């Protein structure tokens, strides 16, 4: 990095570019005189749109090319949606900053119906997230759930074209793109537990790049970082990936972290839930211990069955 230039690796989707510009603006406001440049790139996750992510390598497909750019020093930082960031990082790279979280809930989007409960039996709902699919199937087994890939605009276009009666998207993405008016209902965590890190923006960089770390430090949001730390610790212990429906959501009330999590069979037939409360200093340990509880209460059997291509008992 030149003394006054910082380069951001980002995907080219509208939402990814919004996030990159958000970080760029925050950096320039915090460090007058700093020049920030975007390095847009296409990832495999952006190209492979005809196959569920779970079958082609998971959400890590969205970050690999960005990480290569960091390692080759073509960029100084990479900006990610935290829900797309795998639990492990390549040697020499790490997550150094987590920005303040936007609304982490899932959004019910429909042109005809006001809520999930309003959908008639047999309605077609679009989502490619196994986490969303399993919770929908558990709550409304009478619905037809179909895969839906592509960026936010593409997904809304398919809804508007009549391919689906409703679709499920992230509230955060719709709000960031100025599309909050498309949200019919924001689904509470009790109905659709969010993905790990959903709504948060993470910044990855080289671990030995002290200057960049110092530039990024003011952008870190401690409460969001604690919440996401608890969620990711749980997911790391479960060795969770796109192939398994895993939800995890941490909130902070009165100085205490409340962490909820679930592991489910893709068809919603089996669901294991748990929760923990504790001090912020225990965020990582809470995530690990909650994962252990879920594993003992049936999640291990679900994970084993799904990874072996079997139906959970």
Curated annotation (Swiss-Prot):
Cofactor note (record): Binds 1 dipyrromethane group covalently.
InterPro entries: HemC (IPR000860), Porphobilin_deaminase_cofac_BS (IPR022419), Porphobilin_deaminase_N (IPR022417), Porphobilinogen_deaminase_C (IPR022418), Porphobilinogen_deaminase_C_sf (IPR036803)
Top-level lineage group: Bacteria
MF terms (GO), sorted A to Z: hydroxymethylbilane synthase activity
Any single biological process term in GO: protoporphyrinogen IX biosynthetic process
Pathway(s) annotated for this protein in UniProt: Porphyrin-containing compound metabolism; protoporphyrin-IX biosynthesis; coproporphyrinogen-III from 5-aminolevulinate: step 2/4
Group of enzyme by EC: transferase
Reaction it catalyzes: 4 porphobilinogen + H2O = hydroxymethylbilane + 4 NH4(+)
Residues the record lists as S-(dipyrrolylmethanemethyl)cysteine modifications: 242
Cellular component per GO, a single term: cytoplasm
EC number(s) per entry: 2.5.1.61
Keywords: Porphyrin biosynthesis, Transferase
Swiss-Prot/TrEMBL cofactor(s): dipyrromethane
Role: Tetrapolymerization of the monopyrrole PBG into the hydroxymethylbilane pre-uroporphyrinogen in several discrete steps.
Note: The porphobilinogen subunits are added to the dipyrromethane group.
Family in the record: Belongs to the HMBS family.
Subunit structure: Monomer.
Protein name: Porphobilinogen deaminase
Species assigned in the record: Salmonella arizonae (strain ATCC BAA-731 / CDC346-86 / RSK2980)
Organism ancestry: Bacteria, Pseudomonadati, Pseudomonadota, Gammaproteobacteria, Enterobacterales
């Amino acid at each position: 990095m030149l003394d006054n230039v910082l380069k951001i690796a980002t995907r080219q989707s509208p939402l990814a570019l919004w996030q990159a510009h958000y970080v760029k603006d925050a950096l320039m406001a915090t460090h007058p005189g700093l020049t920030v440049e975007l390095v847009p790139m296409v990832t495999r996750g952006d190209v492979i749109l005809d196959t569920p992510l779970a079958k082609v390598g998971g959400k890590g497909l969205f970050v690999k090319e960005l990480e290569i750019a960091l390692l080759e020093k073509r960029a100084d930082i990479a900006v990610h949606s935290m829900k797309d960031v795998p639990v492990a990082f390549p040697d020499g790279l790490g997550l150094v900053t987590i920005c303040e979280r936007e609304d982490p809930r899932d959004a019910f989007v429909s042109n005809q119906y006001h809520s999930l409960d309003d959908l008639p039996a047999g309605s077609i709902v679009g989502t490619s997230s196994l986490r969303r699919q399993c919770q929908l199937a558990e709550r409304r087994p009478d619905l037809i759930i179909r895969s839906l890939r592509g960026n936010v605009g593409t997904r809304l276009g398919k809804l508007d074209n009549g391919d689906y009666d409703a679709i499920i998207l992230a509230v955060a993405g719709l709000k960031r793109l100025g599309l909050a008016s498309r949200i019919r209902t924001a689904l509470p965590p009790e109905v659709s537990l969010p993905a790990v890190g959903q709504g948060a923006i993470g910044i990855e960089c080289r671990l030995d790049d002290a200057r960049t770390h110092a530039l990024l430090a003011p952008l870190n949001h401690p409460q969001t970082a604690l919440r996401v730390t608890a969620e990711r610790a749980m997911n790391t212990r479960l060795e969770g990936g796109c192939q398994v429906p895993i939800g995890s959501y941490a909130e902070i009330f009165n100085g205490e972290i409340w962490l909820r999590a679930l592991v489910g069979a893709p068809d919603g037939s089996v669901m294991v839930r748990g929760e923990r409360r504790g001090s912020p200093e225990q965020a990582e340990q809470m995530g690990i211990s909650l994962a252990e509880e879920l594993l003992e209460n049936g999640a291990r059997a679900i994970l084993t069955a799904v990874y072996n291509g079997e139906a959970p008992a």
